[in-house]
Structures are given as C-alpha cells and as structure tokens.
C-alpha cells in the first residue's frame, strides 16, 4: 500500500473520486492538477494541503495563485507543471486521471522516477504503449490499472503468470445498446452523455456511447497484459457487474465482480497488494433476478469499436491517429458543431489518410497526434 500520492486531473470525474478515496485511506496528497477548474482545485487544496498544484491553463493558474496566496501551496502553470507534479519528491504513487493524450508526458516522467502509476489515462498506452511498458520495466515502475475492466483483469491474473489463454473484456454497450446504426443518426450530446450504469465525464461518456472507449480499452489491454488482438474477446454485458474475465489455459474462467463504482478500482490501485475496507456498496446478487447477460457486439452498429480493433492490428501510429482524431471529433460533437455519425466518419477518414509508421519513437508519435488533430479540424473546416 502507498502512503503519499499525486493526483493528475483531480477535478475530473476520476480525480474527484480519487480525492475521496485518498481521504478515506488517510493518504498524504502531495500534488493536485487541473486544467482550469480552479474553484474546485482551491477547495481541494485547502482540504488536502498539497505542496503543489498545477494548472495547465495559464490564466486560471494566475487566478489560483492569488486565491491561495494566504497558504504555502505552490502553483505551477502549463503542461510542464503536470510533469513537475508527477515527479514531486516523497511521492509513492501518481494517479494519472487526466483525459487525453496530454497524460503521456507526465506518466513517462513519473515512470522515470520509479513511481507506482495508478493508470486511469488509457490514451497513454493507446498512443505509446510499447514505449511506456518498456520504460516501466527498465525503471522498476509498477503500473496498476484503474479502469474497472483492466483492474478486473489485473486482479484475475495476479499470481497466474503464464496461465492466460484469453481475456474477456466486458462493456455495458452504453446508452444506445441494441440500437441500429441508422437509429443513432440523430443522437445529441445530451443523449450521449447519459450512461445507464456509470457516472463519468462528458468525453468518456460519448466514447462509451460510440464504443470507442471499449476500442481504446482493447488496445490498452494488449499493452498492459502483453497479448495480441486474437487473445481478447469483447462482450456486451448490460448489467456492468462482471467487470471482465480471463480464460486460463485449462479452460477455467475467472471473473471479477462488483457494483459499478470506480472508487473500488481506484482504491485497489493504491492499496495493492493489500485490500482495505471501502465505502462502496456491496454487490447484492438477488438484485438481478433476471440473471447476468453477455452478447457479442454488433460491429456494424458500432463502427468505432471495429475501427479501433483494426487499428490495434495495424499497430504503429495507427492507434495514435485514431485517438487524436477521436478527441477532436468528440469535443466538436459536445460543442454541437458536428453530428453523432460524423465522429466515426472523420476518425475513419483520418486513419485512412495518414499512413501508419511502424515502431515509432516519441517524436513520431507526437507528430502523428498533431497531424490527426489538424486533419479533423480541416475535415470540418474549423
């Protein structure tokens, strides 16, 4: 179990839940970061007394410095401040709860210091999984996943090295489960952000609706557990009780179950290999008299998932391009600037137009990321 942490993205959905878990466990929070939500960041800082708060938005950072002038809390600004928060001294673990590819640099910085990474930023592995996992091995840094599915797989595989046959990656199917492609044409942002089982931020809620989130998790699982696309099967599981499963060499299937509450995998990433009492509700099997259900995904109705699985097989910079294009497209959709189907159409166009580079270094990955973002903006003439 760790005793001191830095929380990157403390004002987001996962970050806020991490703060609550840290308070429950009595952890020392050394650093917090936010993009621009300084009202909540100030409240968290006064409650947790970190040594450092990073604000990526420069204007917001200046305002927070003034607000915290009566304290001894240092305030940094810009993306470099994220890295500063990630490598702060006397920190056992870094929770990477920032959204998007911006999480890559601070994650690598923390890895270089040998920190435990409680990884909630899946884009880090989607964009640079080979590099991140290699550096973690070289630096002796633990990567413990926070995503509920990967935490489940991690828990199922603990102590079973060399026994894995297949990963069974579950997903609820999102708010439009069972809808045809045509039926989703007029979906609005307000409809897409309403997830039936989980409480999440707007961007990841849209990704869950399109099932791009499951595609990103598919790629993340490949890197975390050293498997190929053929070793992962995606299953739609509407109840979100079985968070994922593993099939072992002898045909045994082991599953991790629990209520859909992100505080559980967050806490496990911080207490591993120990377990501590949590404040989460307990699973009541009698609440599911109709049983638990599992279905194969309809890839025609879920083209974003199919595209992600295709990019996983292509490898190189293809997942980076897909992820960057999707980030831009989803934010345009949330701003009511493009339609729901335009998310997939623009991301697929970017993947088709930008040739993948095999075995990329970080500079090539960054260039592919920027090219994909520019492509989508140009695609919609923004």
Where do the PLM segments sit?
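Catalytic, metal-anchored helix/loop core of enzyme active sites in primary metabolism
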Residues: 1-382
């Amino acid at each position: 179990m760790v005793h001191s942490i830095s929380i990157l993205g403390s004002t987001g959905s996962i970050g806020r839940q991490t703060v609550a878990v840290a308070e429950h466990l009595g952890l020392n929070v050394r650093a917090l970061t936010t993009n621009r939500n300084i009202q909540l960041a100030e409240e968290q800082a006064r409650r947790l007394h970190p040594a450092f708060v990073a604000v990526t938005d420069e204007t917001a950072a200046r305002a927070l410095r003034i607000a915290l002038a009566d304290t001894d809390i240092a305030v940094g600004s810009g993306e470099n401040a994220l890295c500063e928060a990630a490598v702060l001294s006397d920190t056992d673990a870094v929770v990477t709860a920032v959204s998007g590819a911006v999480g890559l640099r601070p994650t690598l910085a923390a890895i270089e210091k040998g920190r435990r990474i409680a990884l909630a930023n899946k884009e880090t592995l989607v964009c640079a999984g080979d590099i991140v996992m290699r550096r973690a091995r070289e630096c002796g840094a633990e990567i413990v996943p926070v995503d509920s599915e990967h935490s489940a797989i991690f828990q199922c595989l603990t102590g079973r090295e060399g026994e894995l046959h297949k990963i069974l990656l579950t997903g609820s199917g999102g708010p439009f489960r069972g809808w045809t492609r045509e039926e989703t044409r007029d979906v609005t942002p307000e409809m897409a952000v309403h997830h039936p089982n989980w409480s999440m931020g707007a961007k990841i809620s849209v990704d869950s609706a399109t099932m791009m989130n499951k595609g990103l998790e598919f790629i993340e699982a490949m890197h975390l557990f050293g498997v190929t696309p053929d070793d992962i099967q995606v299953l739609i599981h509407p109840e979100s009780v079985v968070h994922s499963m593993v099939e072992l060499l002898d045909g045994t299937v082991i599953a991790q179950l629990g209520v859909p509450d992100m505080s559980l995998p967050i806490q496990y990433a911080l207490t591993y290999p120990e377990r501590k009492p949590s404040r989460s509700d307990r699973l009541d099997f009698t609440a599911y008299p109709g049983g638990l259900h599992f279905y194969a995904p309809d890839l025609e109705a879920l083209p974003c998932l199919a595209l992600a699985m295709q990019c996983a097989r292509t490898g190189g910079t293809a997942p980076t391009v897909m992820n960057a294009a999707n980030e831009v497209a989803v934010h345009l959709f949330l701003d009511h600037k493009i339609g729901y189907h335009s998310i997939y159409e623009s991301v697929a166009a970017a993947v088709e137009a930008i040739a993948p580079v095999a075995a990329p270094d970080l500079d090539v990955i960054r260039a592919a990321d920027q090219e994909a973002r520019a492509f989508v903006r140009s695609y919609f003439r923004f």
